[in-house]
């Protein structure tokens, strides 16, 4: 009897994850790789994350639409794990079209993605203000409250925009509860239901061309041999399950979140590329063992232009932390590393690398994810000689300064993962592939 032949998943999906506290430079890598993939997918987060892309003497920041939209042969998908501010999305679509790029037919939005409504943003700012010294440091974009409604099974989804009667009923239900909070807890004016219904009554016509069942679309495209690049927002150390809780985001930026946030079956995922800066930054509150509260930290921030792409907030800066990186590489199953912003270190005579921590008089090599313990550790450093010159001309590893090569090799030896992508400047072409 002849044996049957069944389809075997191709593992032609690649995930890009941030391995630090976000802002690692994922946008540049996605932009660089997008012309090598058929589809680029955003799988979690919302407009709280900005991906900065530099090309053709332009600098563009995208918050929701994947960076691949600037590669004309690439299809872009906003997955079910993303929370979407409809007004922000339409503004972004207009911005991309004004730059001369077609969006209709190239952008698909999951019908199951949840929406950020105006009351989510108001709740976000009111709740954050009420926290006093215990603030998380949210962006105030309504991300957390939208995810809260999602998991409380009260959320409004993209598909609801296409049915005005369903949308109206869900808005009434949500505002009945939210207005009690505004009036009785926060002593704010209630939001008028009918006004909000009118605000969203035309969204069905505008957004309908982009909406589809992206879970089925993506899996079918993979079955047909197409390649998919999945881009996360934020970073592993901000993951709600695996990060420095409670100073985390409300979603899963880790590689596991790529599957749940897109609907792509896990066995289609082949490579996981972990993106990390050559130093480290963090926005908002929370433990940061290698933070530099001195002139060196200020210098890193100034050279690296470390201000949030979404909020404009100043980022806290410090040396690279290999204890945290080892943890991130492990839980994400990272197969290769993309090292960004190496050029920021070009003028430092010495570069310090955290290789372990001291905790209660003992050296430890494992990253503590509970905030109380992490806030008590002291970093232990190895110091390397700086290269004191630019690598912007380099297009191969051998063309880089010897001390810069030594820095990269040291990271590889410590982390036991190859660095395959090195950003030596902000431009698309200022990149070394190995």
Curated annotation (Swiss-Prot):
The active site is at 23 (proton acceptor), 51 (proton donor). GO terms for cellular component: cytoplasm. The keyword Phosphoprotein does not apply. Pathway: Purine metabolism; AMP biosynthesis via de novo pathway; AMP from IMP: step 1/2. GO terms for biological process: 'de novo' AMP biosynthetic process; IMP metabolic process. NCBIfam families: PRK01117.1 (NF002223), purA (TIGR00184). Plays an important role in the de novo pathway of purine nucleotide biosynthesis. Catalyzes the first committed step in the biosynthesis of AMP from IMP. Homodimer. GO terms for molecular function: adenylosuccinate synthase activity; GTP binding; magnesium ion binding. It catalyses: IMP + L-aspartate + GTP = N(6)-(1,2-dicarboxyethyl)-AMP + GDP + phosphate + 2 H(+). SMART domains: Adenylsucc_synt. Belongs to the adenylosuccinate synthetase family. It is an enzyme of class 6 (ligase). This is Adenylosuccinate synthetase. Substrate binds at residues 309-315. Keywords: Cytoplasm, GTP-binding, Ligase, Magnesium, Metal-binding, Nucleotide-binding, Purine biosynthesis. Mg(2+) binds at residues 23, 50. It comes from Pelodictyon phaeoclathratiforme (strain DSM 5477 / BU-1).
């Amino acid at each position: 009897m002849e044996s049957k032949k069944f389809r075997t998943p191709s593992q032609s999906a690649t995930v890009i994850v941030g391995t630090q506290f976000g802002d690692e430079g994922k946008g540049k890598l996605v932009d660089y790789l997008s012309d090598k993939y058929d589809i680029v997918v955003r799988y979690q987060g919302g407009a709280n994350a900005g991906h900065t892309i530099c090309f053709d003497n332009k600098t563009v920041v995208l918050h929701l639409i994947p960076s691949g939209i600037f590669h004309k042969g690439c299809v872009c998908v906003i997955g079910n794990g993303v929370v979407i501010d409809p007004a922000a999305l339409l503004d972004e679509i207009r911005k991309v079209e004004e730059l001369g790029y077609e969006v209709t037919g190239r952008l698909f939005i999951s019908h199951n993605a949840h929406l950020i409504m105006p009351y989510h943003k108001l709740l976000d700012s009111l709740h954050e203000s009420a926290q006093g010294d215990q603030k998380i440091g949210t962006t105030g974009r309504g991300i957390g409250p939208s995810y809260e409604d999602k998991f409380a099974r009260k959320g409004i989804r993209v598909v609801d925009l296409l049915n005005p009667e369903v949308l109206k009923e869900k808005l009434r239900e949500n505002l009945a509860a939210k207005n009690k909070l505004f009036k009785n807890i926060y002593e704010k004016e209630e939001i008028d239901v009918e006004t909000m219904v009118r605000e969203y009554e035309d969204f069905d016509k505008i957004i309908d061309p982009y909406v589809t069942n992206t879970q089925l679309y993506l899996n079918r495209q993979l079955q047909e041999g197409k390649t998919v690049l999945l881009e996360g927002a934020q970073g592993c150390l901000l993951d709600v399950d695996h990060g420095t809780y409670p100073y985390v985001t409300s979603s899963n930026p880790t590689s596991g979140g790529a599957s749940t946030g897109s609907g792509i079956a896990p066995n289609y995922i082949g490579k996981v590329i972990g993106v990390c800066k050559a130093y480290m930054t963090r926005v908002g509150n929370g433990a940061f063992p290698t933070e530099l509260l001195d002139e060196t930290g200020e210098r890193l921030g100034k050279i690296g232009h470390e201000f949030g792409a979404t909020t404009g907030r100043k980022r806290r800066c410090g040396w690279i932390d290999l204890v945290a990186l080892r943890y991130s590489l492990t839980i994400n199953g990272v197969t290769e590393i993309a090292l960004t912003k190496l050029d920021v270190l070009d003028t430092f005579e010495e570069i310090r690398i955290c290789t372990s921590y001291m905790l209660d008089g003992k050296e430890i090599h494992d990253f503590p994810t509970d905030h109380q313990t992490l806030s008590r550790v002291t970093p232990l450093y190895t110091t390397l000689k700086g290269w004191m010159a630019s690598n912007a001309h380099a297009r191969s590893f051998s063309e880089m300064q010897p001390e810069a090569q030594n820095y990269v090799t040291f990271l590889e030896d410590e982390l036991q993962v190859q660095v395959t992508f090195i950003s030596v400047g902000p431009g698309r072409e200022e990149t070394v592939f190995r």
